[in-house]
From Swiss-Prot:
GO terms for biological process: fungal-type cell wall organization; protein transport. It comes from the Eukaryota. With SBE22, is involved in cell wall integrity and polarity processes like bud growth. Keywords: Cell wall biogenesis/degradation, Golgi apparatus, Protein transport, Transport. It comes from Vanderwaltozyma polyspora (strain ATCC 22028 / DSM 70294 / BCRC 21397 / CBS 2163 / NBRC 10782 / NRRL Y-8283 / UCD 57-17). Belongs to the SBE2 family. One of its GO terms (cellular component) is Golgi apparatus. It is found in: Golgi apparatus. Signal peptide: none annotated. Its main location: Golgi. Residues 18-48 are annotated as: Disordered. InterPro entries: Sbe2/Sbe22_C, SBE2/SBE22_M, SBE2/SBE22_N. This is Protein SBE2.
Length: 763
C-alpha cells in the first residue's frame, strides 16, 4: 500500500513540475505523502554538451519512440514499469518557445488540406483528467490565446498508475479522438520503457508534439474552411439559379467571414464575351500565364486523350467557376515573416482570388445565359428586337419581377399591384372563356337550326309561298337564317310578282330590247364619264379588295340609263352585288330583271316619300329614340336623315350581310297573290304601272326606318353623321365589323340581325 501511494505521489509531483516549467511558474510544492523532484540550477546549453554526449544513443532511441507515439500498440502492464524507473537529473536548459521555428516546410504544404490521412482526431484537450491528482498547491493563471500551442505536458505527467484506483477518462470532444486513449494506452513506448525521460528528452518530445499538434490544427481548420467555402459557393449558385437557401452547419470558429466571394457584374458580363466556346479560356496556356501569382487550383481540370489520325489529343472537361483556392499563408510568430509582409501578401492573395473567381463566374454565367436566351419569354425577345433589352442581362431575379402586362424596360410593378392585376386578368379571362363557350354553342345551334329551317322552307315552297300561312313562317325564318343561294332568286321573284311574272312581263323593259337599242346607238362619252365617276365614288372607294369591279357593271349601268326609269339611287350597288352573287349564276338577264323589280317595288317613289317624311317628323318611335335625344340634335334634320343617306349605310355593308338585308326587306314587302283579284288575264294596256302599284304593291317603309334607327343607336362610330359617311376614305370601314373567320362573321352578323328585329318590333 505504501509503494502504491509513493508511486502515485511521484507521478503527481512530476506532472506539477512539468506544468510549472511550461507556464513559467517555479518552486511548486508536492503532496504531503510524496517527494518532489527539484529542477537543477540554471545553466547555459554549452555546459551540458559533454554530459549529454553519453546519453545520445538513449535519447535518439527515445526521440524516435516519441515520434512514433501513435503507431505502436503494447500491453497495458508496461505503464507501471515506466513510472517506477530511475529519473535522470536535468542537465540541459530548454530554450524558450519564442525561438522555436518551423523545422519542416511541409507544415504549410498546400496538399495538407486535402490529405486524406490527416484528421482532427489529434486535436486534444489536456485538461485535468485525473481525479486523484492533488493540484491544490498549483498557482492558477489565466490561459492566453496560445493555449493550444504552448500547453504541452510530459507524457509521464499524464499517466496514471494502473494498480491504483482507476480514474474515469475525460469526456471526449465531439468530432475528435480521446487523448486519454492515445497517451495512456498500454502500447505507449514511453510508458513501456524502464528509464524515465530526462528534462531534455521531455523538451524534445514537447517540440515534436507541438509541431504535430500545430500541423493537425492547421489541417483541420483549413479542411473546415474549404468545406464551408463549398457550402457558401453552393448557396450562391442556388440563390442565383433556383433561389434556394442552403443552411451552413459548421463550426463558426473555423470560418473566415471576411473572405470576399465571387460576384457577377453587368460590366463583366458585357466585357466577357469570347469567341472561344469549345475550350474554356482557363485551359489555354495564354490564359494560364495571366493567373495571379500564388493562386492554385483546388481541383485541377480533368483531361482525357482521344486518338485523331494516330495522335493523342487532349480533351478538356470544363472546370467549376469556383475552382480556385487561396495558397497557404504563414503563421505570424512561427514563420520568419513580419506582420506587414503577412498582411500584404494576404491582401494580394484575397484580391487575386476575388478577381479570378469573379472572371470565371462571369464567363460561366455568360455561357449559361447565352445557351438559355432562346428559352426566355416572348416579351423579352420582342424587347430585344426593338433594342430595349439585352438577353444576356436577364436573370431569374429579373424574370420574377417582370409581368406580361408591363414591358420589361419599364419599372416593375409593386407586388400588390401585380396580384391585383393578375386577379383582374383572371376574371376577364374567365368571362372571355364563358363568352367563347356560349358563342361556340350558339354557332352549333345555328348550324342545326339552319338545317331545320331549310326543311321548313322547302315545305312552304311546295305548299305555296304566297299563302298567308307560308308568308308568316317565311318572315320568322328570315330573322334566323338568310335564304339559300339556290332558292333566293325564285323566292324573290314569286314574292314580288307571283309565279306569273306580272311586273317583269308588263312593266319592265326586257334585257334583250335594251341591249339592241344600245348596240344601235353610239353612247355619249359624257354620260359614260358620269357613270364611271359614280362607280368610283360609291363602289371603288368603299370596298377596297373585297370584291373586284366587274366590266359588266359599267355595261349594265349604261343599259339602265337608256331605260324608261333611268338611273336611280342604289342601281350601281345592286348591280355590283348581284353580278357576283351565286344566286344569279352570272346571268346578266336575271340581274337586270331583279334590279328593276326591286327598285319598282321595295325602293319605289312612294316608299322614298314615306321614308323622308316619317324619319324627321312623322314616326313616333323614331322621334322617341332620336327626336327627343340631345345627342342627335345636330343630325335630326332632312340633310342628315333622308333616303339618300340610307344608301350610304348600305354601301358600307359586306356582301353576305347585304344579301341577308335584302332578303329581309323583300320578304317584308310581300303580299298574298293567291287571294288577289289581279291576274295575268286582268292586266291590259289600260292598267298603267301607277295603277298597278297603288293597288297591288306593298310599301313597307317601317323596315327601312328600323334599319336606320339601329345604325344610329348601336353602330354610330367612325363617322359624325350619315351624310359624311359617304365621304369616309377608309376602304376597310364596314358595318358591322367584317371578319375572315366564318364563326366570327356569323356572330357579328347574327347579332346585327337580332338587334334589327328588336327595333322593328317597336314599329
Amino acid at each position: 500500500m505504501d509503494n502504491r501511494s509513493r508511486s502515485s505521489s511521484l507521478a503527481s509531483n512530476v506532472r506539477i513540475k512539468s506544468y510549472s516549467s511550461l507556464s513559467s511558474h517555479s518552486n511548486s510544492n508536492s503532496n504531503s505523502n510524496g517527494r518532489s523532484i527539484e529542477a537543477p540550477a540554471v545553466r547555459r546549453p554549452s555546459d551540458n554538451l559533454l554530459a549529454s554526449e553519453s546519453k545520445k544513443n538513449e535519447l535518439d532511441q527515445d526521440y524516435l519512440n516519441a515520434i512514433n507515439l501513435q503507431n505502436h500498440t503494447k500491453s497495458s502492464s508496461c505503464i507501471g514499469s515506466a513510472l517506477t524507473g530511475h529519473v535522470v537529473p536535468v542537465k540541459e536548459r530548454p530554450i524558450s518557445n519564442d525561438s522555436i521555428s518551423t523545422r519542416n516546410t511541409d507544415l504549410f504544404s498546400s496538399t495538407s488540406i486535402y490529405t486524406k490521412n490527416s484528421s482532427s482526431e489529434d486535436i486534444f484537450n489536456d485538461g485535468d483528467s485525473n481525479g486523484t491528482d492533488d493540484t491544490s498547491n498549483i498557482t492558477s493563471k489565466p490561459e492566453n490565446c496560445n493555449y493550444l500551442l504552448n500547453r504541452k505536458e510530459s507524457i509521464i505527467s499524464e499517466g496514471q498508475i494502473t494498480n491504483s484506483t482507476p480514474t474515469p477518462a475525460p469526456t471526449p470532444i465531439p468530432g475528435s479522438n480521446n487523448i486519454y486513449t492515445h497517451h495512456f494506452a498500454p502500447s505507449n513506448p514511453l510508458l513501456r520503457s524502464k528509464t524515465a525521460l530526462t528534462p531534455s528528452q521531455q523538451y524534445k518530445l514537447h517540440r515534436v508534439r507541438s509541431d504535430s499538434l500545430l500541423r493537425n490544427i492547421i489541417n483541420t481548420n483549413d479542411r473546415n474552411l474549404f468545406n464551408s467555402s463549398n457550402l457558401i459557393l453552393q448557396e450562391h449558385d442556388d440563390e442565383d439559379d433556383d433561389n434556394e437557401e442552403v443552411q451552413i452547419d459548421v463550426n463558426n470558429n473555423s470560418l473566415n467571414w471576411n473572405v470576399p466571394m465571387a460576384s457577377v457584374s453587368t460590366t463583366s458580363f458585357i466585357n466577357s464575351v469570347t469567341n472561344d466556346t469549345d475550350i474554356p479560356t482557363h485551359v489555354k496556356k495564354s490564359k494560364r500565364k495571366n493567373h495571379p501569382t500564388g493562386l492554385y487550383r483546388a481541383s485541377t481540370y480533368t483531361s482525357s486523350y482521344t486518338t485523331i489520325n494516330g495522335r493523342h489529343t487532349p480533351s478538356y472537361v470544363p472546370e467549376s467557376p469556383y475552382d480556385i483556392a487561396l495558397p497557404t499563408t504563414p503563421i505570424p510568430g512561427i514563420s520568419n515573416v513580419s506582420d506587414l509582409e503577412y498582411m500584404r501578401d494576404t491582401s494580394k492573395s484575397l484580391s487575386a482570388l476575388y478577381l479570378q473567381s469573379s472572371g470565371k463566374l462571369s464567363e460561366s454565367r455568360l455561357a449559361q445565359r447565352t445557351r438559355s436566351s432562346s428559352l426566355l419569354p416572348l416579351e423579352f425577345k420582342e424587347a430585344s428586337d426593338h433594342g430595349m433589352e439585352n438577353l444576356l442581362l436577364v436573370s431569374n431575379h429579373k424574370r420574377s419581377f417582370t409581368t406580361t402586362t408591363r414591358p420589361c424596360w419599364l419599372p416593375p410593378k409593386d407586388p400588390m399591384e401585380i396580384k391585383s392585376h393578375e386577379k383582374q386578368i383572371s376574371q376577364h379571362l374567365d368571362e372571355v372563356s364563358v363568352f367563347e363557350l356560349q358563342r361556340n354553342n350558339s354557332f352549333q345551334d345555328h348550324v342545326h337550326n339552319n338545317k331545320v329551317n331549310q326543311d321548313r322552307l322547302q315545305t312552304i315552297i311546295d305548299r305555296g309561298l304566297t299563302r298567308n300561312s307560308s308568308l308568316k313562317i317565311l318572315k320568322e325564318i328570315i330573322w334566323e337564317n338568310s335564304l339559300p343561294d339556290d332558292l333566293r332568286l325564285s323566292i324573290w321573284n314569286e314574292i314580288l310578282q307571283s309565279s306569273d311574272n306580272l311586273i317583269s312581263n308588263n312593266y319592265i323593259e326586257s334585257f334583250d330590247s335594251i341591249n339592241e337599242i344600245y348596240s344601235n346607238l353610239q353612247f355619249p362619252r359624257s354620260k359614260e364619264l358620269e357613270i364611271m365617276k359614280l362607280i368610283d365614288k360609291n363602289i371603288k372607294s368603299k370596298y377596297g379588295d373585297n370584291l373586284e369591279i366587274s366590266e359588266n357593271l359599267l355595261y349594265l349601268l349604261k343599259l339602265k340609263s337608256l331605260s324608261q326609269q333611268g338611273l336611280v339611287t342604289g342601281d350601281e350597288l345592286l348591280f355590283h352585288h348581284f353580278i357576283y352573287d351565286k344566286s344569279f349564276k352570272f346571268s346578266l338577264n336575271d340581274v337586270w330583271t331583279m334590279v328593276n323589280l326591286i327598285q319598282k317595288t321595295c325602293f319605289n317613289d312612294i316608299c322614298k316619300d314615306f321614308y323622308d317624311h316619317q324619319i324627321v317628323n312623322g314616326n313616333k318611335v323614331f322621334a322617341q329614340y332620336i327626336g327627343n335625344n340631345e345627342e342627335f340634335s345636330k343630325e335630326n334634320n332632312s340633310t342628315c336623315l333622308n333616303y339618300g343617306t340610307l344608301w350610304n349605310i348600305l354601301e358600307r355593308m359586306d356582301h353576305n350581310i347585304f344579301m341577308w338585308i335584302l332578303d329581309i326587306i323583300i320578304i317584308h314587302n310581300s303580299q298574298n297573290f293567291k287571294n288577289s283579284s289581279i291576274s295575268k288575264s286582268n292586266i291590259n294596256n289600260e292598267i298603267t304601272w301607277d295603277i298597278y302599284r297603288t293597288k297591288n304593291v306593298v310599301v313597307n317603309y317601317k323596315i327601312l326606318l328600323s334599319f336606320t334607327l339601329l345604325i344610329l343607336l348601336k353602330y354610330h362610330f367612325g363617322f359624325n353623321n350619315l351624310s359624311e359617311l359617304s365621304l369616309l376614305n377608309d376602304k376597310q370601314f364596314c358595318i358591322p365589323v367584317a371578319s375572315k373567320n366564318v364563326q366570327d362573321e356569323w356572330h357579328f352578323t347574327s347579332m346585327f340581325i337580332r338587334k334589327w328585329n328588336y327595333y322593328y318590333k317597336k314599329f
